[in-house]
Design a protein with these regions (language model features):
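Active-site metal-coordination segments of metallo-dependent hydrolases
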Residues: 37-47, 78-91
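Short, well-structured alpha-helical segments
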Residues: 24-32, 45, 49, 69, ...
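Non-membrane alpha-helical segments in proteins
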Residues: 33, 37, 71-74
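Divalent metal-dependent phosphate-bond-processing catalytic cores, especially two-metal-ion Mg2+/Mn2+ enzymes
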Residues: 1-14, 36-43, 54-64, 101, ...
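Histidine- and acidic-residue-rich, metal-dependent catalytic cores
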Residues: 89-122
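Alpha-helical scaffolds flanking conserved acidic
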Residues: 62-72, 105-112, 126-129
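His-Asp-centered metal-binding catalytic motifs of divalent-metal-dependent phosphohydrolases/nucleases
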Residues: 51, 65-80, 89, 112-117
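An amphipathic alpha-helix signature
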Residues: 7, 11, 25-29, 52, ...
């Protein structure tokens, strides 16, 4: 999907929800700038496009599409080495919602974004679906997953031994859970492959094999 198509879709949605057209243009420009930063290898505009495309397939299962859509766009708006990325991204989302003059229901987007910090959702079905959507890449094909793993590595300018140690810790936390995915919808479609992919990467990292 080209940037022009993304922009058209963004503006149409904001207009449909009664938002401010001028602010829609400004915020879209901000988001594109954030996601096309040269430091971004995985958490880029392609990641947003991937999530938007997949979300359309599950749209019938989403209760608050406005919040869901906004959360996709803003969930990685702030991406640096700090631990507060999710919180800062959620705050930026709320700022945009207020300036866009969107309905009160849009504020739920912030909670969806915050749920990605631990990828353990509350009882909210939308939150479960959203965190699963953010992790959908884990259940992708072997080739696609390896590309994702390499992109994640490229975002960290640290020695290999430090990256491997931290990455293994993160992946093993997911593998220690009863399920990687929160929703039945994603478990049925992606759980098995996600388990295979994560186990492969952990073993590769422990052996020092190139991803």
């Amino acid at each position: 999907m080209k940037v022009e198509a993304l922009e058209t879709n963004w503006k149409q949605n904001v207009k449909c929800w009664g938002g401010n057209s001028f602010q829609a243009q400004r915020w879209f420009a901000y988001l594109v700038k954030q996601y096309t930063s040269k430091e971004r290898k995985y958490h880029s505009l392609n990641h947003v496009i991937y999530m938007l495309s997949l979300a359309e397939k599950f749209k019938a299962n989403v209760h608050n599409w406005m919040a869901f859509y906004l959360a996709i766009w803003f969930h990685d708006a702030i991406q640096n080495k700090l631990k507060a990325n999710e919180k800062l991204s959620a705050q930026k989302c709320l700022e945009a919602i207020d300036e866009l003059n969107l309905p009160a229901d849009a504020h739920e987007a912030a909670q969806l974004i915050l749920a990605t910090e631990s990828h353990r959702a509350s009882e909210s079905s939308d939150a479960k679906l959203f965190v699963d959507l953010d992790l959908a890449i884990l259940g992708s094909s072997k080739e696609e997953y390896r590309r994702y793993a390499r992109q994640c590595r490229a975002e960290y300018k640290i020695p290999n031994f430090l990256y491997r140690r931290g990455r293994i810790k993160v992946l093993e936390k997911f593998l220690q859970r009863e399920h990687i995915y929160q929703s039945d919808l994603f478990r049925k479609r992606y759980e098995y492959q996600a388990q295979k992919n994560l186990n492969w990467e952990v073993e590769a990292l422990k052996k020092g094999v190139s991803l």
